[in-house]
C-alpha cells in the first residue's frame, strides 16, 4: 500500500513515472482487447515522451505499437505508414545510442579526473584529447535539438576545463548549463 501511494505521488512529479505508468495502462488495455483505447494511450505517451525528451519511454511506446499492430495483422495500415513508424523508431534508437556514447565519454572523463586528478602537464592534457574529440563529434552529429545532448556537452566541457585548469572556461560552461536548464524547465523532475 505504501509503495502504491509513493508511486502515485511520483507519477505527478516525475515524467518517467508518468510515462511508464501510462505504458502499463496501454498494455492492460491491449490485453483486454481494447485496441482503440490502447493505441490512443500509446499515441499520447509518444507525444508526451517527445515533449519531455524521454527517448526510452518513446522507444517502448513505439515498439509496443508495432508489436500490437503486427499481432493484429496491420489492420487498416498501408506499407508507407508502417515504414514511417519504423523510421521514427530507428531515429529514437539513434538518439539513445548517441546519448549513451556521450554519457560513456563523460563517465570516462570523470573516472580519469577522480583517479588521476588535474592535468599537470601538456602530456596529461593530450591524453584527454581523444575524449574531447569524440564528444564533440557526437554533439556535431546529433543534428536535432536535444536537451540531454546539450546538458551532457556542457557538463563534459566544464569538467574537462576543470581538469586542465581552465577555470574561466569551466565557469562559462556552467553558466551555459544553467541557461539551458532555465530555458527547459518543463524537463525538470520535481523530487
Question: What do these predicted regions represent?
Answer:
Residues 43-51, 84-94, 130-142, 171-187:
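Amphipathic alpha-helical segments of tetratricopeptide repeats
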Residues 1-32, 70:
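Intrinsically disordered, low-complexity protein-interaction/activation regions
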Residues 22-31, 63-72, 104-123, 151-166, ...:
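Tandem amphipathic alpha-helical repeat scaffolds
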Residues 75-130:
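Alpha-helical repeat/alpha-solenoid scaffolds of the HEAT/ARM/MIF4G superfamily
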Residues 12-20, 57-59, 66, 99-103, ...:
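Start-of-helix signal in alpha-solenoid helical-repeat scaffolds, especially tetratricopeptide repeats
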Amino acid at each position: 500500500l505504501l509503495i502504491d501511494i509513493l508511486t502515485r505521488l511520483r507519477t505527478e512529479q516525475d515524467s518517467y513515472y508518468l510515462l511508464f505508468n501510462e505504458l502499463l495502462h496501454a498494455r492492460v488495455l491491449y490485453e483486454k482487447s481494447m485496441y482503440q483505447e490502447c493505441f490512443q494511450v500509446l499515441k499520447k505517451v509518444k507525444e508526451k515522451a517527445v515533449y519531455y525528451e524521454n527517448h526510452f519511454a518513446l522507444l517502448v511506446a513505439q515498439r509496443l505499437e508495432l508489436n500490437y499492430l503486427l499481432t493484429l495483422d496491420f489492420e487498416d495500415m498501408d506499407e508507407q505508414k508502417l515504414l514511417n513508424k519504423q523510421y521514427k523508431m530507428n531515429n529514437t534508437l539513434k538518439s539513445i545510442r548517441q546519448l549513451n556514447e556521450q554519457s560513456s565519454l563523460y563517465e570516462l572523463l570523470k573516472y580519469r579526473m577522480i583517479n588521476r586528478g588535474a592535468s599537470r602537464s601538456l602530456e596529461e592534457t593530450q591524453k584527454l584529447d581523444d575524449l574531447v574529440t569524440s564528444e564533440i563529434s557526437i554533439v556535431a552529429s546529433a543534428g536535432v535539438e536535444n536537451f540531454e545532448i546539450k546538458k551532457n556537452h556542457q557538463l563534459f566541457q566544464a569538467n574537462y576545463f576543470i581538469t586542465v585548469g581552465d577555470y574561466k572556461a569551466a565557469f562559462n560552461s556552467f553558466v551555459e548549463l544553467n541557461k539551458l536548464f532555465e530555458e527547459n524547465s518543463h524537463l525538470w523532475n520535481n523530487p
